[in-house]
Structure formats: C-alpha cells, structure tokens
Amino acid sequence: MNIELLTPALGAEIDIDLGNITRQDAQAVYDALMAHQVVFFRNQTMTPEQHITLAGHFGEIDVPHPIYQNHPAIPAITVLENDADHPPDTNDWHKDLTFRESPPFMSILYAQKVPETGGDTLWANMALA
C-alpha cells in the first residue's frame, strides 16, 4: 500500500484495491484518515456488497439517509445523481448529516461517473481554519 500526501493541510491518496481490503489494510486506511482528514482512492471498481463491507471495517453502518434515494438492495448506501435531469440540491459547504444526534464519523463517496471538467467536490480542514 502506498500513501501519498497531497497537501500540507489535508488529503492523501492511497493506492489500494478497496474491493478486497483486509482488516490490516483497513487499519492503515483509518490511520491515514486520522492523519490527513480525507483520503482518496483512484480507479476503484466495487459492487454494492463490497462497498458496504468496506464501510463495515470502520464501524457501525449508519441508517439510510432520510431524504435521498437509497440503493434498492442495500438501503444504507445512498445513491446521489447529479446530471441535467438531477441537478445537485446544494452548492454550499456542508458536513453530512450534522442534524442527527450522533452524526456519522465519516462518509465514503464512491463516484462512478465523473465529468471531464467541473463537478468538483471540495474538502476543508476545519481544525486548521
């Protein structure tokens, strides 16, 4: 596993196949997340079952999102569509699910279709802000 720091403030890229992650690999990913606030994994292919298994390595799976569409076979996976027919409903800085009594400790975003330009998702290190 190779971990590459992206900026001094936050972010690391990890070269690993998330579809076949081991407990030991998951611990290394968790440690990188704690050190760098956000981690990125390029060129991934995961089934919904692998996605939820990956999430389970990091703690209890959260309940389905109350507003957005959920995966038909695995309701704990939220399905977001952003295209001409489904424009994003927010363009503001936010943290996922902060309205809950116990917000989730992390989110896993698995982008399956990414535009050539635009469509950026940005992160900020609030500890350094």
What are these regions (language model features)?
Residues N2-A129:
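Non-heme Fe(II) oxygenase catalytic core, chiefly the N-lobe of the double-stranded beta-helix
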